[in-house]
């Protein structure tokens, strides 16, 4: 049975032709977290043995709680980057309500993320009641803040902000309500995404004063974040990528080319460790990455090892009753045999043979008061029309 899928996010969701013996510019280290051995190996050739589980072929509708500290200011998606873009709407809002980014950066927003009214069981049971057949939670976004009790990222929701393991709450609620559970990971791009935090104002009374993106652990003495290293969050102890001051350049460098500053092995391995840690703790049925192919491909084998680990781990935990679904965006035909294709805010223009997914949101990917105040969030009829289009293909 063919199945097309629609994942709705609430703001409250190179192929080289060389399959073996490929040398990677930034090979991942397995010093901390070992890849689960099993049927799948970290090569495209091996991963193409993947078969989409029947449960996902039959599912049609999922809901994604794309929710984290970037919702605090109500400025919409990518606000943790945009607050460092001088003159932007997000910058102006941040300066007016919180302070100048040389003094108050995104790190200082994290304690304001309280989640004091969060009731995961109530929400997930509601999602199931309205038809959700699987549920996704945000594990981390490009802001590099982990929403669980992360042993490899000190900037996490247990240490700073809610003082709660958000993923654990979502996972328990999904299990209680009998919904397959998914986690999305986006922090691999924090390396280049946060580069504007290295900037400074070019105009006005703060001209030339550096933003907080280059602060170190030593700078925190006597401050609320004493003992924490801002570089563990911002990851900006590296040169800027080519054209970094051009705000849109990051989109051309998303696949780790076009002059992007190549991340270090330490950075790549940290993302690998965090992702494997979350997989091992919460045993998700689905994982999603906001990437071209898999994380850090083609400069690193980290993403391929994550994929192999996820599939093999799922086989062990499920005792052979395989349930794993891993999504990738902008995939070659061969890569689509190894992963499930995800199309962000769109759909193919014709029927596609294999299962695929559209991910979309009611408004912005993070809460945006402007959209709410102007009535620009999707209506129920908008969602139904999109769902019909997706499922029909």
Task: List each model region and its residues.
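Bacterial Sec-dependent N-terminal signal peptides
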Residues: 1-23
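Mature catalytic domains of secreted/periplasmic carbohydrate-active enzymes
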Residues: 22-393
């Amino acid at each position: 049975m063919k199945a097309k899928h629609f994942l709705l996010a609430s703001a409250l969701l190179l192929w080289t032709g060389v399959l073996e013996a490929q040398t990677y510019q930034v090979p991942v280290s397995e010093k901390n977290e070992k890849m689960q051995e099993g049927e799948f190996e970290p090569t495209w050739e091996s991963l193409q043995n993947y078969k989409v589980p029947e449960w996902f072929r039959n599912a049609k509708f999922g809901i994604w709680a794309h929710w984290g500290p970037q919702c605090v200011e109500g400025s919409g998606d990518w606000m943790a980057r945009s607050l460092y873009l001088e003159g932007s709407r997000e910058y102006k809002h941040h300066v007016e309500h919180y302070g100048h980014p040389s003094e108050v950066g995104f790190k200082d927003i994290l304690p304001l993320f309280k989640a004091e009214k969060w009731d995961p069981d109530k929400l997930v049971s509601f999602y199931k009641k309205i038809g959700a057949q699987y549920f996704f939670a945000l594990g981390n976004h490009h802001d590099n803040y982990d929403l669980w009790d992360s042993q490899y990222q000190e900037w996490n929701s247990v240490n700073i902000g809610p003082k709660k393991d958000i993923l654990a709450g979502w996972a328990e609620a999904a299990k209680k309500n009998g919904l397959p559970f998914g986690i999305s990971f986006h922090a691999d791009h924090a390396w280049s995404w946060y580069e504007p935090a290295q900037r400074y104002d070019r105009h006005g009374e703060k001209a030339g004063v550096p933003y907080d993106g280059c602060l170190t652990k030593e700078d925190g003495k006597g401050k609320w974040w004493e003992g924490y290293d801002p570089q563990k969050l911002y990851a900006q102890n590296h040169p800027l990528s080519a054209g970094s001051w051009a705000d849109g350049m990051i989109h051309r460098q998303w696949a780790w080319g076009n002059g992007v500053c190549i991340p270090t092995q330490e950075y790549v391995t940290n993302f690998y460790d965090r992702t494997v840690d979350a997989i091992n703790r919460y045993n998700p049925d689905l994982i999603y990455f906001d990437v071209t192919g898999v994380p850090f491909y083609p400069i690193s084998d980290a993403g391929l090892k994550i994929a192999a680990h996820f599939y093999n781990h799922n086989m062990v935990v499920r005792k052979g009753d395989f349930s794993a679904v891993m999504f990738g965006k902008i995939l070659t035909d061969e890569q689509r045999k190894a992963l499930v294709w995800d199309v962000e805010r769109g759909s193919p223009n014709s029927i596609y043979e294999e299962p695929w997914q559209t991910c979309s949101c009611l408004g912005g990917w993070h809460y945006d008061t402007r959209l709410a105040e102007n009535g620009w969030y999707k209506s129920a009829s908008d969602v139904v029309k999109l769902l019909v289009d997706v499922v029909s293909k």
